[in-house]
Structure formats: C-alpha cells, structure tokens
Amino acid sequence: MGNPARKFSKARRDSRRAQTFKLSLPGMVECPNCHEMKLAHRVCKKCGYYKGKEIVAVEK
C-alpha cells in the first residue's frame, strides 16, 4: 500500500473531510391549504391537511 509523501496539516485534512459531511436544509414547501411552510411529503402542522385531505384534526 502506498504511504503519503508528506504530512497533511490538520486544517487541510479537516477542510477536505468537511465537504463530505455538508448539512443540507430540509425540503420546505408552502402548504396549499393554509400557506404556511411545511416539510415536503408530510402533514401540515398548522392545519393538519395533506394532499387536500384533512388527516389530523387541529384545534383552532
């Protein structure tokens, strides 16, 4: 197996590793019923609707 020719500094090593562990924002979309931002493919926490149907009864 090949060995590194010279030592990588900790900063260079860490900056290289950081590229593979980037955090991405979750997919947020606007609820078509109440126009609040919600996670995609999930029931809206504000109104309880998903795909035009009331899934969860929310007290108003």
UniProtKB/Swiss-Prot annotation:
Gene Ontology cellular component annotations, sorted alphabetically: large ribosomal subunit
Keywords: Ribonucleoprotein, Ribosomal protein
Coiled coil regions in record: none
GO process terms (BP): translation
Signal peptide: none
Keyword Ribonucleoprotein annotated: yes
GO function term, MF aspect, one: structural constituent of ribosome
Matching Pfam families: Ribosomal_L32p (PF01783)
Family classification: Belongs to the bacterial ribosomal protein bL32 family.
Name this protein carries in UniProt: Large ribosomal subunit protein bL32
